[in-house]
Each structure stands twice: as structure tokens, then as C-alpha cells.
């Protein structure tokens, strides 16, 4: 979608039904301002990009069974309406550039997807996600992205899993026609965190961020039951 078209849709209520599935009614107007600001900041960073895609991925909270995912236990948890949003423009430069609000921009070359020993930041997460997609046969040629998040780091609602879900959802939607399901998206995020970032996390955080809603998860056989309607990570436009 062209940037101006996106802005017009936000202003005229074209995305209100989508926003209503993500945010509380009283928050929709402030969220519109947040999305408009994100697009403006993206435009300032990448002025030559005019076709954009916009994504949202939620944080999560656990209700019961925290940490038992490591022992193949059962968890009740839910996605929250605090999320990370990403504005992306896809291209064929074989590089991923990401600028997150409050952090320096980083770049990941798609010609070098090996683990970088000692590099444990967001760049390694993105490198691991891209590597896993390539292992699965998905051809990626690059994108530029600006992200802003109210899933605060260190707040206990999985800012890293939300970021992983955002990146994997963007890649899957554009380069793979949304063919990878929510469970596989979660596994890709866990793979990047385990083998590239170096954190031996379980799968609960990524699963809840990816499948959305209020959910019962059985990690013995990796099954799930939605207790409420899911609010999946989504492509806004």
C-alpha cells in the first residue's frame, strides 16, 4: 500500500475494524496516532520507500503454569493489547535494515546468516529468523523496517518474543504468502533465540504471542485450545 493511502485509511476509519480486534475501544484513536507517527518516522528514515506493509504483534501474560513449558507441561496464558508495530518496505537488496524506537539501526546481510559469536542483540534474532526461513526453502531478498513497541523490555510480557513474532510474520506474509502457521512462526522465533541469541528459552512466550487470544497450551504434544477468540499477529495493510 502507498504511504498516502495508508494514512488516508487511518484518518477515514478504513482500518477501524482491524484496530477494534486488537485494542480497547477507548484506545483506538490514540492507536491511530501511534500508527501515523510510526509511518512518519519510517518515511523520515527511508525516504525512497513508498510501498509499505504494517504489522502488529502482541506481548503476552501467563495465568498459570509458567516455566512448565520446559518440562512439557501445561500453561494458561494470553496475548495482551500492548504490542510492537512494524512499518516495512520490501526490496531486492539482500539486506534487512531495522530501526527500533530508542535503539540504533542495524543491518543484517542475507549473504551472511551464520551465527556471529559474541553478537547477542536484536541483529542476531533477525539473522536467526532469516536463516530458519531459508532452511525451510523460503527465498528472502530484504526489507527496511521501523518498529515501535509498548511491550516494554524487562516488563515480563515478552518483548523479545513479540519482536520475533513481528519479524517472522512479516517475512512469512510477504515472501511466503502466509503459508507458515502460528505454531511454526513460534518455533522459528524460539530457534533464533536458542541458537543465535544464545538464550535457551522454552516455547511458551513465542506460542502465545503468535497464536494470540486467551489460550490453554499443552507442551507434551504441542496442542492448544483457545479459551477466547484469538487476536493473532497481523498485517494491518
Language-model regions: role of each:
Residues 2-157, 161, 165-182, 187, ...:
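ATP-binding N-lobe of GHMP and related small-molecule kinases
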Residues 69-71, 223-224, 228:
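Short acidic (Asp/Glu) patches
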Residues 225-237:
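Single conserved hydrophobic/aromatic residue that forms the stacking wall/gate
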